[in-house]
Amino acid sequence: MNLIVSSAPHIRSPRTTKHIMLDVLIALLPATAAGIVFFGWVAAVTIVLAMFTAVLTEFVWYIIEHKIWRNGKETLANFAAQFDFTSLVTGLLLALCCPASLEALYMPVLGAIFAIAVVKMLFGGTGKNIVNPAIAGRVFLFISFMAMVSYPEANFAPLLSYTDGALST
């Protein structure tokens, strides 16, 4: 009997990180839609800002890291070829973790910059970070703006108006 020892990964799949992250984005669509329906335009703006800032931060990091800021068309093509949707997932998760009462629109921007630049890219990029970048961005926002993100307010009254006594004991 031959014992074969090999390093991980032991299960191999043809699916790439890009495909897996796209599946994660699709799986988060119901939660995203519910957040926008329940909390309105503030949630939609927070989601768009966090996702856009996360992708922009990764793009700027890519430009700085590869020192290719002179040729814009080639830079965009190279970035698009290696883009794997992880920054979109990080931005979306960060936005979904933020409270609904978050009306200071610079907060998801700062959280996304911290999540991508400090937590993800500083440690080597996709798969090499020591903590989840989205949650680290949320913790950064909590530590930096404790009073503004500690007491979220949700208005579920329109949803519960059809069920009298839903919140009573």
Give the residues covered by each predicted segment.
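C-terminal ends of transmembrane helices
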Residues: 56-72, 116-128
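N-terminal signal-anchor module of multipass membrane proteins
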Residues: 1-59
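Long hydrophobic alpha-helical segments that form multi-pass transmembrane helix bundles
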Residues: 133-169
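Cytoplasmic-side transmembrane-helix entry/capping segments in multi-pass membrane proteins
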Residues: 73-89, 108-110, 128-139
